[in-house]
Structure formats: structure tokens, C-alpha cells
Amino acid sequence: MPIGVPKVPFRSPGEEDASWVDVYNRLYRERLLFLGQAVDSEISNQLIGLMIYLSIEDDTKDLYLFINSPGGWVIPGVAIYDTMQFVRPDVHTICMGLAASMGSFILVGGEITKRLAFPHARVMIHQPASSFYEAQAGEFILEAEELLKLRETLTRVYVQRTGKPLWVVSEDMERDVFMSATEAQAYGIVDLVAVE
């Protein structure tokens, strides 16, 4: 059995025979996008490109972003969030499995009233972390200042999109806070929990 991305048949309008395309290309044609890994520059650029392309192709049809991510890099995650706010179609966000760290930030960035979690999904928020522990003192201070700015940005977005007070979000981001789907709904990160 071959290992890799599964292929599915797809027939373009006006064609008699179907051609085999990988499952993700087929789903993209239906405006279904997937973040199923840690956020990095590569997946961020792919999702941004798809959202912009699909928005240009038809700005009246909504986009659906399925999320199962342990988090990842802050700047590429913020770029995905900003693109979701920029494109004209509404972006539905659907948490399946885990939306942690940057994954939860992208989840909360979906169109308000169109953010959903599957019943057994988990959501986790926390403050951004630095990977530059071995930097010189001067570099570390600059890094810490940038980290504080990023933390403030993320906190403001969570406050705006959840309706929670600033002090609650700030306190919760001090540590890893895990939530069930219903707890994430009560917190305001998602609007709906899918029924079993």
C-alpha cells in the first residue's frame, strides 16, 4: 500500500472523465482548509496563499479552516490570523483534536458566531515563549521587549474576540490553561460545540 497523501477522483465541470487529485486539492476546491501541524512559515504561507486565492476566485463563499495544531511560531500564526481578518469571505474555524497556543489564537480569529469545536476537542492558551535562551545579554533584553509586545498583541486580540476582561485573559495566559470544548465556548474562544 502506498504511503502519502490519498488521491480521490475529481471531475471538472464540462469534462466526462474524472482525474485523480490528492485529497487536499479536492477539499481546497470546496473551500475547506486544514491546519493539521505545528504553525511554521511554510504552512502559514500555504494557508495565506490559499485564503487569498479563494477570496479572489469568489469573495461571496465562506472559507472553512479545520484546526488540529499544537501551536508553533508566533509571527506566522499572527500572519494567518491577519489574513483571516483581511479576506472578504467569512472564515469559519473548526477545532478538531487540539488547538493549542497559536492554534487557539487562529481558532479565536474565525468569524464571530462561526467558530466551532468538536465535542472532544481541547483548547489551550498561554503566553508566547522565546527560543533564544542562549543569546547575549543585550540581545536577550531586545528579545524580551519584543516578546512583551507580542504578548500584549495576543492578549488584546483574545480580549476583543472573547469578551473576557483584560485582567482575566492576562492572568490565564501566565500559564498553560487547557479547556474542553464547552469550557472554550464559555470562555468565548468558540461559539458552538458540535453535537455528538
From Swiss-Prot:
EC numbers for this chain: 3.4.21.92
Subunit architecture: Component of the chloroplastic Clp protease core complex.
Lineage: Eukaryota, Viridiplantae, Streptophyta, Embryophyta, Tracheophyta
CDD domains: S14_ClpP_2
Membership in a protein family: Belongs to the peptidase S14 family.
Protein name (database record): ATP-dependent Clp protease proteolytic subunit
Top-level class of the enzyme under EC nomenclature: hydrolase
PROSITE patterns in the cross-refs: CLP_PROTEASE_HIS, CLP_PROTEASE_SER
PANTHER family, per database record: ATP-DEPENDENT CLP PROTEASE PROTEOLYTIC SUBUNIT, CHLOROPLASTIC ATP-DEPENDENT CLP PROTEASE PROTEOLYTIC SUBUNIT 1
Gene name per UniProt: clpP
Keywords: Chloroplast, Hydrolase, Plastid, Protease, Serine protease
